[in-house]
Structures are given as C-alpha cells and as structure tokens.
C-alpha cells in the first residue's frame, strides 16, 4: 500500500490565524439553536484549520436580542437564579421579567454555558457582542459580514 501524501495534520499557530466578524440576527430564532451556532463560531470550529488549543475563533455581533424566542412552555417555566452573597440572598427571575430587563443577558448566559470553562474559553467569549435592537453602527470598523443562521 502506498502512503497518501495529503494526510498531514496541520497545527495552526495563533500568529497564522485571521479574525473576521459576523452579524447574526436573533429575531425569531430559537435561543438554544442560535446559541450553539454562535458558540461554534466563537470557538473557531467552523474553520477547516480548527486547532483546539489556539484562540482562532471569529467575532460575533448578535442583533435584535429582545426578539429571540423559546419553544414549548419554557417561556413560563424558565427561571434565572443568582446569589447576592447575603443570607437568604437567592434571587429568582422568570424568563419574561429577565427579557424585559436584560435581553442581552439571556443570550450571553446561553452561549456562555456552551463555551469551555477555561482561560481560552473566557478569551473567546470576549469576541461576543450582543445588541438590543437592529443597530450595529458602533461595530462598522470591524467590517462585519451578515450571517444567516
């Protein structure tokens, strides 16, 4: 048997990577499906040259954060919890209240749960921008590409 010559594994260095920015519209999209696709882009898994230990992911700008949706009865059942640090300080906020107060947090929380809990994961998460509304003029210098998910 002759050995194939195109089966070499390439390890990409961080200096060899290029970072591009994408705009994702969350209007009418399901929260989990949107979050998993965005997490994949942030990690760089959509690239052919994906290397797990290199921060090679792209940046993502999510617009229309307040128009994301949940399926089934989760709209009335989903609860966000946090602890204030004081005795009896456990706070619970239903999805609908959180959507009215902080729609950006809902998407950020979902994407953060899909990222690795390491230093690299935190670095990759810094490339995420979530915007309420459909205006992203503040990020025009990144020359973002509209991505349909």
Swiss-Prot record:
UniProtKB keywords: Ribonucleoprotein, Ribosomal protein
InterPro entries: Ribosomal_uL13, Ribosomal_uL13_bac-type, Ribosomal_uL13_sf
Protein's UniProt keywords contain Ribonucleoprotein: yes
The keyword Ribonucleoprotein is annotated on this UniProt entry: yes
GO MF terms, alphabetically ordered: mRNA binding; structural constituent of ribosome
GO cellular component: cytosolic large ribosomal subunit
GO BP annotations listed: negative regulation of translation; translation
Name of a matching Pfam family: Ribosomal_L13
Family: Belongs to the universal ribosomal protein uL13 family.
General function of this protein: This protein is one of the early assembly proteins of the 50S ribosomal subunit, although it is not seen to bind rRNA by itself. It is important during the early stages of 50S assembly.
Quaternary state and interactors: Part of the 50S ribosomal subunit.
Name this protein carries in UniProt: Large ribosomal subunit protein uL13
């Amino acid at each position: 048997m002759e050995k194939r010559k195109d089966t070499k594994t390439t390890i990409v260095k961080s200096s060899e990577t290029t970072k591009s920015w994408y705009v994702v519209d969350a209007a009418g999209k399901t929260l989990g499906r949107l979050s998993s696709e965005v997490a994949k882009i942030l990690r760089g898994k959509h690239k052919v040259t994906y290397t797990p230990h290199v921060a090679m992911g792209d940046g993502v700008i999510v617009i229309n954060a307040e128009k994301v949706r949940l399926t089934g009865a989760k709209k009335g059942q989903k609860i966000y919890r946090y602890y204030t640090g004081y005795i009896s300080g456990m706070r619970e906020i239903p999805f609908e209240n959180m959507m009215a107060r902080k729609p950006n947090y809902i998407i950020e929380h979902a994407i953060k749960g899909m990222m690795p809990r390491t230093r690299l994961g935190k670095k990759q998460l810094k490339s995420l921008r979530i915007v309420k509304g459909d205006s992203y003029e503040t990020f025009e210098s990144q020359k973002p590409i509209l991505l349909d998910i």
